């Protein structure tokens, strides 16, 4: 079990509880007790949901209105038909614009700033070559940003992927996913991973067709459905 309290300015902390499928129920309830001690109004992300765990949280009076699927696929996958290029510092403003247009509805990925991008670029895992961009007529149309994990196992993640709304309906989402997966395979990875909102039916269907399957379900629980995420 992994337990983390994420503190946020002017908002209740978010508690993250990560459990393996074979963790004992006692370990789970102990983790929930720790989460409740962080504050009764603290939202709880349960990373690794199953029916028994959900029933227990419901019995405590918690409700869930959001779930994420962690999906994985074996590599390699078919190659993308798109020509992509690596990210450069000069792309920051265009990336922020496309990201915020594509994710204006998203609780975490919306409202990104150049400063946020700079912070991500300063991390040990950042690799500009693994941040693939696709231009149409000189404008950034889509991007696929990958992230490599080494602990507890080597894993290549599609970290953020988006298509500018002006270019929807051209199949760019699928092709950019394939471009990112191809880069990860070229970097030596045999498994690709991503997170997607469970109710994003179009995205889930796209990933299903590529070969992704659901590896884990993460659910957000809270006592008051009006509390900000």
Predicted regions and their residues:
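Acyl-donor-binding surface of acyltransferase catalytic domains
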Residues: 20-82, 221
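Conserved donor-binding loop and adjoining core beta-sheet/short helix segment
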Residues: 1-38, 141-155
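Short, high-confidence coil segments that cap the C-terminus of an alpha-helix
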Residues: 39-41, 129, 189
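Conserved acetyl-CoA-binding loop-helix of GNAT-fold acetyltransferases
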Residues: 23-37, 160-165, 169-186, 204-209
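A short beta-loop-alpha structural element at the N-terminal edge
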Residues: 83-97
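A conserved beta-strand-loop-helix scaffold within acyl/acetyltransferase catalytic domains
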Residues: 4-10, 108-163
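Conserved active-site alpha-helix within GNAT-family acetyltransferase domains
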Residues: 48-66, 174, 198-216, 224
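Conserved hydrophobic beta-strand within the GNAT/NAT acetyltransferase core sheet
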Residues: 44-46, 158, 192-196
């Amino acid at each position: 079990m992994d337990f983390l309290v994420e503190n946020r300015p002017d908002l209740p902390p978010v508690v993250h509880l990560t459990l393996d499928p074979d963790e004992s129920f006692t370990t789970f309830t102990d983790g929930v007790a720790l989460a409740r001690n962080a504050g009764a109004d603290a939202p709880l992300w349960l990373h690794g949901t199953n029916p028994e765990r959900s029933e227990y949280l419901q019995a405590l009076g918690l409700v869930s209105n959001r779930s994420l699927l962690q999906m994985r696929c074996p590599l390699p996958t078919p190659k993308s038909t798109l020509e992509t290029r690596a990210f450069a510092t000069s792309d920051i403003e265009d990336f922020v614009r496309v990201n915020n247009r594509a994710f204006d509805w998203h609780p975490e990925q919306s409202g990104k700033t150049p400063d946020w991008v700079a912070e991500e670029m300063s991390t040990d895992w950042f690799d500009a070559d693994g941040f693939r961009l696709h231009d149409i007529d000189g404008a950034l149309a889509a991007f696929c940003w990958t992230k490599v994990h080494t602990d507890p196992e080597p894993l290549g993640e599609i970290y953020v992927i988006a298509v500018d709304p002006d270019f929807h309906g051209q199949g760019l989402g699928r092709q950019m996913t394939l471009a990112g997966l191809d880069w990860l395979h070229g970097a030596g990875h045999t498994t690709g991973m991503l997170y997607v909102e469970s109710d994003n039916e179009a995205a889930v269907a796209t990933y299903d067709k590529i070969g992704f399957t659901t590896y884990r379900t993460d659910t957000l629980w809270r006592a008051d459905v009006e509390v900000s995420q």
